[in-house]
């Protein structure tokens, strides 16, 4: 197994973790029903990009 030779500094640890942050879900408002939904997802009543898909 690989074992590190030298201790990683707080700065290096922080640089590694800089890409780990989560982003909030992007929300959109449907043009037909005015309902809020996640981007690129079907609304709860079955509309996607203004068309009934479900």
UniProtKB/Swiss-Prot annotation:
Basic residues composition-biased segments: 7-16
GO biological process terms, semicolon-separated: translation
InterPro entries: Ribosomal_bL32, Ribosomal_bL32_bact, Ribosomal_zn-bd
Pfam families, A to Z: Ribosomal_L32p
Molecular-function annotations in GO: structural constituent of ribosome
Polar residues bias (residue ranges): 25-34
UniProt entry keywords in alphabetical sequence: Ribonucleoprotein, Ribosomal protein
GO cellular component: large ribosomal subunit
Superkingdom in the source lineage: Bacteria
Region of interest: Disordered: 1-54
Presence of keyword Ribonucleoprotein: yes
Paired cysteines (S-S): none
UniProt key word Ribosomal protein: yes
Similarity section: Belongs to the bacterial ribosomal protein bL32 family.
Descriptive protein name: Large ribosomal subunit protein bL32
Organism: Tolumonas auensis (strain DSM 9187 / NBRC 110442 / TA 4)
Protein's gene: rpmF
């Amino acid at each position: 197994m690989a074992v590190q030779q030298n201790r990683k500094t707080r700065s290096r640890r922080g640089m590694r973790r800089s890409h780990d942050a989560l982003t909030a879900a992007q929300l959109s408002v449907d043009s037909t029903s005015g309902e809020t939904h996640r981007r690129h997802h079907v609304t709860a009543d079955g509309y996607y990009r203004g068309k009934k898909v479900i």
